[in-house]
Amino acid sequence: KQKTAYEIRLSLVGSEMCIRDRIYTTAGSRRAVVSLDAKTGEILWTHSIDEGERGQYAPRQLSGRGLAHWESDSTGEEQIIYVTPGYRMMALDAVTGNPVASFGDNGIVDLKQDADQQIDLITGEIGLHSTPIVAKDVVIVGAAHRTGGNPKSRENVKGYVRGFNVHTGERLWIFHTIPLPGEYGNESWLNESSAYTGNTGVWAQISVDLDLETVYLPVEAATGDYYGAYRPGDNLFSESLVAVDLNTGERKWHYQLVHHGIWDHDIPCAPILADVVIDGQLRKIVAQPTKQAFLYVFDRVSGEPIWPIEERGVELGDVPGEWYSPTQPHPTKPPPYDRQGVSEEDLINFTPELRAKGIEVASWHKMGPIFTPPVVSSIDGPLGTLMAPATGGGTNWPGGAYDPENNMVYVVSNSSVTSLAVVPPYPGQSDMAYIQGSALSGPRTSGGAGSVSYTHLTLPTKRIV
């Protein structure tokens, strides 16, 4: 029987990383970096900084989800790179834990600066809780914001993506997830709404194909999550998978998975890169799990869908001032790996009494297929739109993985239902006409609370619990 060699107790721990005989992780409310001896568990060094008010205003606090490692091919120099809660990128010597003096300002790059926008260094609501990614000599950093259902303002910080030199911390490139005037995609923001709209960060993990020198960016929704009247248009590159050049940040291709999102369908996890034989041909693919339980699969060189993605008509809502897209993308393969939308047939049916109660509760709400829009909540009904998967997915940041031996993609999915509605804000709460209303969750449905799903890339989707 295998015995436990040692146990280390750390509070608020991020994902651990083992490099040879050392373990690195983040821990604690200040996101300290900790280095451990992998054999004994001895703490070799720790590093943290006190960010004062800036850390207190940070939208993504605590330990975060981990850190990155870089090693020089020529000198063997090793660095640990991470982003603090206050949105500073730090490079530490992997052996000593000391800041790397040649990187930025004595080991620190202030990510609130040189960002092609004005960001208040103390109160600017932008940060990152996922890890930066190092590819060759480029460090790529995304951005995260506060949860966007109840924004204080229609104006917010933009979540641009940047690449930095791993040796010096110099900014190499920036990709504007909300295009500037004259850039591709700016025309998808009507009424000059690109000027003040924010968010569209990449808070999920980023993937890189080193051979193709291509970075795959899973982009979140724009301000606000459920009410988009102040940003009419399709809103590129919100809720899009974007491929950019590793060395320059220039867009190679993109595919928008949700037009003018009003459902908080951020792309929540790392794109999955795989080389797969499809119809007798070896294809380099990128597969993107989503909150809406669709697996979108593309040729990762060209961006062309491996199987057709149809633009299907969806219901247009009646929230005052809202702009609606008449269609939304629906993959034809693979099939959805979790429940989409809610109908009376989905309600709980363990006993006749529970079934009747489920129908009664559901009658207070609007029901329909995926992409049924939110409503203005009313005490006279409907209270909200029953949404499945809920705003947390489907799939969320744990994402999925590819098994090359069995040609399977495995994803974790949450089968929960939520009631989605908007309401006028309280005086002084927001300058938006409507924000998210969250009085109650949706009714229980049959089929359980979640599943692990697997998709054979040439066969139907299956679910395993």
Predicted regions and their residues:
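C-terminal substrate/ligand-recognition segments
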Residues: 20, 25-26, 392-420, 430-457
